[in-house]
Amino acid sequence: MRKLRVAALSISAAACGPGTEVARGPEVVTDTIGDTIVVHTVSGSVWGSDATLTPELSIGEMDGPDEYLFGSVASIAVDDDRNVHVLDRQGQYIRSFNVDAQYVRSWGRRGEGPGELANAAAMAVFADGRILVRDHGNNRVQVFGPGDAPPEEWGYNSGNYGSSEPLWTDRESRTYVVAPDLSQPFGARDNIYIVFDPDGVVRDTLRQPHAGFRQAVVRAEGGGATVIRSVPFSPRVISVMHPDGGFVSGISSDYSIDRDLPDGVLRIERVYVPVRVSPRQADQEREEAERMIGMSIPGWQWDGPPIPETKPPITGLYVGLGGRLWVRVSTEGREVENPDHEPGNPFSSAVRWEAPLRFDVFEADGTYLGAVNPPEDFSVYPPPVFNGDEVWAVSRDELDIQRVVRYRIALESQP
């Protein structure tokens, strides 16, 4: 039998003075369908207002000691003691800093030998102090530490596949390494996840959720060339690993996110207002695709699926170290002048489209806390690290200097 209840949560007013208006919590509909628990937020939030992220400290300088100069930050990891570890793609090494942003030590260097990195792109840390680095250039996970322990190498067949996905680990010290399914034909390969136990032994291989789903594409053929390009704003699969194990996933066109549980599924949903795609932006996306594909197939014109009139509600998923879910949602774009425009370059546009970042934040049980609007210099690449009310992320200033910044959630209604 289907069970349904409506719950209206409220924020305590114990600290409020007379006449203070108390914000109500979210209106939530819960449902149980088979082994799936659905938590559907209709309106409201626990916080009662939007939040932002305020910087607490930063690591990185334009000039100064080499330890504080970053070339290109590829990955960030934060351990249980709140030490932060930074993987530099340009230098192919890791620098570790304590909770006060003071440099502690470095790990690795460019190369192919033990303890060396060739094309490292993602990093994670274990509770015992070990640092793990996914290095598809060397076809292995490189393991450093704890302390001065000799490095270890956990080999796997990367298929020379470089991915921007994080290196996932869980509370049982299992490691999930993304790789292509080499049993499938080239150009149509799904991602798989190779599961290592804490000692580096492969124990399982998992398929990405919704593996049969295919994003809409335009396909052009001519002169012996084949070019495939995704249709802008078309739905796609988004999935991440939860620190308790299991996937958190969804199709971006639906505000419906499934978290795998040992005995079922927790489905998190929220009412949303669709965000339109500006016709001007759709035209620009189509023209850019025609120019790019035209480099390989001269004269090609768009003949694929239309660009959607609305953006998918979800553009990214992130799970915090404590299990909170951060959902990056679509926002309306605006035209801005392209400061890097090259008038003589036909592939350089005079304007570009920008959309502000915005996250919906849920507790691990699906309770909607509220929305977070990060500052303009906040970047989602590499993926930030979320830990309770703290967030570690890369910021770039007007001179394009990278810094790793620790932020804290603050309600925008607070003085």
Residue ranges and their predicted role:
Residues M1-A14:
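Sec-dependent bacterial lipoprotein signal peptides
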Residues C16-P415:
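Eukaryotic scaffold repeat domains enriched in small/polar residues
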